[in-house]
């Protein structure tokens, strides 16, 4: 009986020490949140750099994208008194299309909330917005 208890205790310790692997969809979800947090804090260039086309965009178009992000935040400020925070909700992996849908919750200053889906793809080892 004592040997069985020791074996059970040993197995429990080994199982408890098992390294927990972080799922790719969890990494993609956190990356999406970071991109939108950067946008929220006025780092428009970092947000645009998180888009799939960032390495092929001509400088003039990149500036237009940055201007669009500024206008978007201005519109949200006008309609909802701005975005208070972005929360990461969940992520769903689509193995057929090789992407992850990251579900974020925008919490506005007027107390309304909006759920947003951000399609994410992995490119060169980093998760970026599609």
Which positions does each model-derived feature cover?
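Short, low-complexity N-terminal intrinsically disordered segments enriched in polar/charged residues
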Residues: 16-41
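Short solvent-exposed beta->alpha transition segments
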Residues: 29-30, 34, 45-97
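Exposed beta-sheet edge and beta->alpha loop/turn motif
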Residues: 87-130
């Amino acid at each position: 009986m004592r040997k069985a208890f020791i074996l059970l205790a040993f197995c429990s310790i080994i199982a408890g020490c098992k390294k927990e692997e972080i799922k790719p969809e969890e990494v993609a979800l956190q990356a999406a949140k970071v991109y939108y947090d950067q946008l929220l804090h006025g780092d428009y260039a970092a947000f645009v750099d998180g888009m799939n086309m960032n390495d092929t965009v001509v400088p003039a178009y990149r500036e237009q994208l940055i201007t669009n992000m500024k206008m978007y935040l201005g519109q949200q400020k006008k309609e909802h008194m701005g975005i208070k925070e972005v929360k990461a909700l969940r992520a769903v992996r689509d193995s057929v299309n090789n992407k992850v849908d990251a579900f974020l919750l925008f919490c506005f200053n007027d107390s309304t909330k909006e759920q947003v889906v951000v399609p994410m793809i992995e490119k060169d080892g980093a998760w970026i917005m599609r």
